Amino acid sequence: MEAGALATLSERILENADFPYIKVESSLQAVKDIAEFYLQQLQIPVVGITGSVGKTSTKEVIASVLKEKYRTLKTQGNFNNELGLPLTVFRLRDEDEIAVLEMGISDFGEMTRLAKIARPNTCVITNIGTCHLENLGDRDGVLKAKTEIFKYLQKDGHIVLSLIHI
């Protein structure tokens, strides 16, 4: 509250709380839902970037080019998971014109949840390698998990694929 928050989220009833709070079933799910709603209200284009390797470098290059013409917000560092993506979305302001969002996963279903928040206009897949095989099985599993991003690609959106295999 000292940082200026109007309320906090809690998964339990806070007896004798001297600050406003919202009781939720899951704090993480609530944060993701709020981020999804907030980004939809801003109605700015989103570039969603995923892949086995090269996500951060690709994000940096794309954001560098876009910032020459547009006020661009990009994922800081590799805040690319189910908590990091919403935290990035919360940094967006009305004056931002485009968001470049990195999305990293290690299991099936994660990309669907990230893409639901981002709803990208452009999807970039850097490559499909052999990362996270412990949960995804093989390269085909990685491909299946990464391409979950397409479930929430905006109508008339664009897809950029790398033809380089690792």
Predicted features, each with a name:
Residues 1-33:
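N-terminal leader/targeting and accessory segments in enzymes
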Residues 164-166:
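Conserved small/polar residues in nucleotide/adenosyl-binding loops
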